[in-house]
């Protein structure tokens, strides 16, 4: 089977780190020899600098919504071209903590940035490059934020209003409903049930991929 790009998406507190561990474990059980993990924003020296700016902001300066989304796409193109595509080319599988769907949901939905601009940015930066599978961990914003707060200090994005995350979730769900490569999973369940659902979804998808070979 050819190398694949799998992405884990969701709001704060959805359990993406746990999901990553489950996915990597399942891929290794399946005999995948090399699995590369990435996160967005981040993953290259420049992208990590941009991550800090997006997450923490700049003292004394308001970070505008458009500046935010442009930095996210700058970080994304660095990661895709310097890490993800080379890994896939050598036969490795890539598991990403967030990708373009995050921008479409957070900046397009949460921030309310014009849909045409979001599509233009995506098409310009990524072209036809997209994940083979996205696991969207759906969780009510209030529940997710409570989990995030329990981890400690919140970053600039995590401090947004509940209404912001409601809009973000709504956009996630709308996009997932029209894209067959996105699998929506109930992340509000107990951890054991979520992990089991991830394994089941991934195994079913792997079986479908093997059937196409």
Swiss-Prot record:
One of its GO terms (molecular function) is dTMP kinase activity. It is an enzyme of class 2 (transferase). It catalyses: dTMP + ATP = dTDP + ADP. It comes from the Bacteria. One of its GO terms (biological process) is dTTP biosynthetic process. NCBIfam families: DTMP_kinase (TIGR00041). Phosphorylation of dTMP to form dTDP in both de novo and salvage pathways of dTTP synthesis. Belongs to the thymidylate kinase family. This is Thymidylate kinase. It comes from Edwardsiella ictaluri (strain 93-146).
